[in-house]
Structures are given as C-alpha cells and as structure tokens.
Amino acid sequence: MTIFLAGFAQAQQLGVPQTAVLTISSERLFADSEFGQRVLREIEAEGTLLAEENERIVAELSREEKDLTEQRAELPPEDFRPLAEAFDEKVQSHRDGQRAKLDALARRSEEAQQMFFELIQPVLIDLLRESGATVIIERSSVFLSSDRTDVTESAIARINVVIGDGSTIENQANE
C-alpha cells in the first residue's frame, strides 16, 4: 500500500494524473508543439509561394490566350488549330505541374506528422509509466471523461523539451 501511495504521490508531483486511462488530443499535440508549429509555418509559406507562382502562371496564360484569340480571326483554321492545341497542352502541363506541387506539399505535411508521432512515442510512454496508466486514448474518441485524464498540455511541454522544433532532427534524417 505504501509503494502504491508513493507512486501516486510521485505521479502527482510530476503533473501527471494517477489513473488507468489517459486521454490526449493528437491534433493539439502536433499543432501546439514547437515541432508542429514550425512545420505548419513552413507548409503555409510554401503554399503561399505556390499560390503566387500559380497566379503568375494564370496571368501569363491569360495573356497568351488573349493573343491566341486575336490570331484566330487572322489565321486560317489549319494554321490556328496547331497553335490552339499547343496552348491547350501547355495549360494542361501547368495544371499537372501545380497539382503535383500541391500533392508534394500535402505529402510533406503528412510525412512530418508521421515523423513527429514516431519521435514522441518515448515521451508518451514515459507519461504512461509515470501515471501508472495502461492506455492513452485519443480525446476525440472519448464520449465522456474528466479533464484530469487529459495529458495533452503536459505532453506538449515535455515534447518541446525533448525535440524542440525538430529542425535538427529533420535535417539529420534528410542527410
């Protein structure tokens, strides 16, 4: 009994509730951590650059389309058709290129989240052990629980200490 109470007191001192079940918000865990905030800033910046690039391409293609429309009145159909087809191919190529860049950006975000959750596993295991809990459940999947079981804030604080914004870890993984 004394050992159990000592473990309970130790868990309480560490800011971890003593319970068999803990809850956590994985969305907040990522979004509110230094790692997640850095990734989200980078993705947003790359998305903004991509949107600006797309606007430039659309403006360029609009000018070309206007020129092509003006040429249509002056050229015989057999001369105009290859120009129109080449323009259509160019438009489709730009669309495909931009779509591929958006897909790559989404993949990068997913890969960063996957890496994050792999990196934080030891932190969550420590929380689990310190609390004496047997399971950590996604908070959004729980119908009703006490806020005492939510260790999201505690986990974020520990994650920030252990991996920070993760930039050095990601750089090492990319080398």
Task: Annotate each language-model stretch with its function.
Residues 11-175:
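Amphipathic, charged alpha-helical segments and their helix-to-coil junctions
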Residues 1-7:
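Bacterial N-terminal signal peptides
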